[in-house]
Curated annotation (Swiss-Prot):
CXXCXGXG motif repeats lie at residues 143-150, 160-167, 182-189, 196-203. Residues 5-70 form the J domain. It is found in: Cytoplasm. One of its GO terms (molecular function) is unfolded protein binding. This is Chaperone protein DnaJ. A zinc finger (CR-type) spans 130-208. Its main location: cytoplasm. Participates actively in the response to hyperosmotic and heat shock by preventing the aggregation of stress-denatured proteins and by disaggregating proteins, also in an autonomous, DnaK-independent fashion. Unfolded proteins bind initially to DnaJ; upon interaction with the DnaJ-bound protein, DnaK hydrolyzes its bound ATP, resulting in the formation of a stable complex. GrpE releases ADP from DnaK; ATP binding to DnaK triggers the release of the substrate protein, thus completing the reaction cycle. It comes from Thioalkalivibrio sulfidiphilus (strain HL-EbGR7). Keywords: Chaperone, Cytoplasm, DNA replication, Metal-binding, Repeat, Stress response, Zinc, Zinc-finger. Zn(2+) 1 binds at residues 143, 146, 196, 199. Its cofactor is Zn(2+). Belongs to the DnaJ family. PANTHER family: CHAPERONE PROTEIN DNAJ, DNAJ HOMOLOG 1, MITOCHONDRIAL-RELATED.
Length: 377
């Protein structure tokens, strides 16, 4: 199989600068590096292909020969030399030091503390109107005895002899070398010979801290409130993590929430549904009167504008949507049953339809059986 053009492999123009070559190789290597694609032979071959192209095109003499004679003018197997006599492993480390655990030099590594999550349960009223609550959170904080060093008072951590205090060691893997976290000091660059008794050399201790959380009006289940710097303490002087307060709103006995709208089920009597009337409805702002028109059917929705939840982001206020449910009367007396029968008879006697949904359903049933007779002939 013919070898691909080196410029095509890297996806750059033939007049690409050294910075453009480096950027292109970095992108491809991040995508196809064997450590990121274990067992993927295709990615491994693409990485080798990109490496070869980068080595040739970053060497001025080899690039000139390649531009003039193509692949015949260069011998990639001749080595990993590059501009100025630098080895390819140096170039690789320069490009990927931050990906595979740091670069040359530096000191003991610092680590940001882990983020924490706290689940906060609120009532609907607390979520709608906002509130301020106190929470108690377990966390790892800096040891007050050793101030995070992990060493006993009067002593100091020693430099790790394995990595020389860098926290990284270079490992040879096939045709290139990468840096990995030092297995002895675990990346700290230090060894503690006299550990602090309070934290056992960890530099951090577990502690419960009480925090005040301001909950803005309009939050809903799934929302998160971030408290910067209230997570676990960092290592080796690293910055602390953050605390994320996860909101959970408890079910309400009257309302259910959909976005910024509130839903409410309102039972009404048979007489009110037929004759109309006025009901007192609870809202977040107090009580309001809801007019029920004559001949209202069960399931009808009534929307009360701006009686829902104010948006936590400052948008328009939601609505209160009331769904009426016509209740069938129960525990009827003999006289009440007689009156209902009398009403039913008078409704059947006239030619007027009094139950539109029932009449429509009966018409549909009649048509269904007529069709059934046709197909069964």
């Amino acid at each position: 199989m013919a070898k691909r053009d080196y410029y095509e492999i890297l996806g750059v123009a033939k007049n690409a600068s050294e910075a453009e070559l480096k950027k292109a190789f970095r992108r491809l290597a991040m995508k196809h590096h064997p450590d990121r694609n274990p067992g993927d032979k295709e990615s491994e071959e693409k990485f080798k292909e990109a490496k070869e192209a980068y080595e040739i095109l970053t060497d001025p003499q080899k690039r000139a020969a390649y531009d003039q004679f193509g692949h015949a003018g260069v011998d990639p197997s001749a080595g990993g030399g590059a501009r100025g006599g630098a080895s390819f492993s140096d170039i690789f480390e320069d490009i990927f030091g931050d990906i595979f655990g740091g670069g040359r030099g530096g000191g003991s590594r610092v680590y940001r503390g882990s983020d924490l999550q706290y689940n906060l349960e609120l009532t609907l009223e607390e979520a709608v109107f906002g509130t301020e609550v106190k929470i108690r959170v377990p966390s790892l904080v800096e040891c007050g005895e050793c101030h995070g060093s992990g060493a006993e008072k009067g002593t100091t951590p020693e430099t790790c002899g394995t990595c020389g205090g860098v926290g990284q060691v270079r490992m040879q893997q096939g045709f290139f070398s990468v840096q990995q976290t030092c297995p002895r000091c675990h990346g700290t660059g230090k060894m503690i010979t006299h550990p602090c008794k309070a934290c056992h050399g960890q530099g951090r201790v577990e502690e419960h801290k009480t925090l005040s959380v301001k909950v803005p009006a309009g939050v809903d289940s799934g929302d998160r409130i971030r408290l910067s710097g209230e997570g676990e303490a960092g290592i080796n002087g690293g910055p602390p993590g953050d605390l994320y307060v996860q909101i959970h709103v408890k079910a309400h006995k009257l309302f259910t929430r959909k976005g910024n709208d509130l839903m409410c089920e309102v039972p009404i009597s048979f007489a009110t549904a037929a004759l109309g009337g006025e009901l007192e409805i609870p809202t977040l702002d107090g009580r309001v009167n809801l007019k029920i028109p004559e001949e209202t059917q069960s399931g009808r929705l009534f929307r009360l504008r701006a009686k829902g939840v104010k948006s936590v982001h400052g948008g328009a206020q939601g609505d209160l949507i009331c769904r009426v449910s016509v209740e069938t009367p129960v525990n009827l007396t003999k006289r009440q049953k007689e009156l209902l029968k009398e009403l039913d008879e008078t409704m059947k006697a006239g030619g007027t339809r009094h139950s539109p949904q029932e009449e429509g359903w009966l018409d549909g049933v009649k048509g269904f059986f007529e069709d059934l007779k046709f197909w069964n002939k």
